[in-house]
Amino acid sequence: MATKRSLFGTDGIRGTANTAPMTVEIAQRLGQAAGLYFMRSQNRRHSVVLGKDTRLSGYMLECALVAGFLSAGMDVILVGPLPTPAIAMLTRSLRADLGVMVSASHNPFTDNGIKLFGPDGFKLSDEVEGEIEDLMSQDLSARLASPAQIGRASRLTDAAGRYIENAKASFPRGLRLDGLKIVIDCANGSAYRVAPTALWELGAEVIKIGCSPDGLNINDGVGSTHPETLCAAVREHGADFGIALDGDADRVLIADENGNLVDGDQIIGLIAAFWKQHDRLRGNTVVTTVMSNMGLEKALAENGLELQRTAVGDRYVVERMREIGANLGGEQSGHMVLSDYATTGDGLIAALQVLAVSVETKRPASEICRFFTPYPQLLKNVRYSGTSPMSSPDLAAAKAWADERLAGSGRLVLRASGTEPLIRVMAEAQDEALVHEVVDHVCDVIRAIAHA
């Protein structure tokens, strides 16, 4: 039986580079354990696809993982800086046993992380991650490869081109982006080559920002965590669309031609309504998380569509989609999962679907990207030290008070961050003053608990 996961969080392993768990030693150990776990058959060669984003520490962790996989007897296919969804796609395409992405997504360059994908291109389950952790705690020396069985490392030189073609295949074949001026912000991250190229090949005039990575500037004032940069660039250049990706390009936000931001909820609603009109939305159901706006749920219901919510994290969205057979899901933060085209969140493919709606309907972004009127929503993060306040009776009482105040008109969501000592407090309701009252009170209670 697998032990409780301690290394793996809600999206792989993540932490400060060169500090546990993001050390050379742990990365090498992970490579050995994951390699041995996925080498089920001994009568053929086994392989892993290994990609990364543009962080300086990516070189260090990449080399450590390579050493671990090779010592386990697994061949390594290196693809260099590519989006996370590209690693998932290539793992399936190359019939590899495993895919690995070295990235901390939207975090600053000082952090890094490791995400694992199975041979089907989906993120590993909690159970499999737990079993790999079990292996990491064991003495593996007797199970490592003999000198003749050590793995080989090679580089896939056309990996970027393969992903570009895969992304373009999601765009209707009869359409082009001629006449559209598009600002693309790649967060100085892993999509800095592939995203502008894909848009240009489809006919767009492309203006690039956040496409000059130096190892230290990923997500630094650019990308989906700093959408104000994109919005300003759209206004400056008189562009028709703006697209902001995060460091590993698994999430996307849009700016319309006026430089107004469009979040993930609006993108989900737009795609859902368009797909329903064209009989492409499976089960008339969309999967989102507890953070998605109640306004989206109401608008979907008015269009005859059901919204199902999961815990925060695109992996949980994907799991629910697979359970019920849905083909559209995502998060307010910009993770968009379109399972007709990808097994995980893919910012570029999601952006192409929005562009396709605009081209097909001949309507500007400002018209198509306002699917619903959002309820006033407020999110605050409260940092703590020591024991998490989530199990405190005082916090339970505060939540009960908030639920009573919001009854019938709104909701409160409390969530512990999976990567930082933070409690996220989110409330929404049609009464904005009530939202602020509830969030401020609950945050005050958390602070009091943290300093008690």
UniProtKB/Swiss-Prot annotation:
Class in the EC hierarchy, top level: isomerase
Cofactor annotation remark: Binds 1 Mg(2+) ion per subunit.
One term under GO cellular component: cytosol
Keywords assigned by UniProt, alphabetized: Isomerase, Magnesium, Metal-binding, Phosphoprotein
Cofactor(s) this protein requires: Mg(2+)
Documented EC number(s): 5.4.2.10
Swiss-Prot/TrEMBL catalytic activity: alpha-D-glucosamine 1-phosphate = D-glucosamine 6-phosphate
Function: Catalyzes the conversion of glucosamine-6-phosphate to glucosamine-1-phosphate.
Name of the protein described by the UniProt record: Phosphoglucosamine mutase
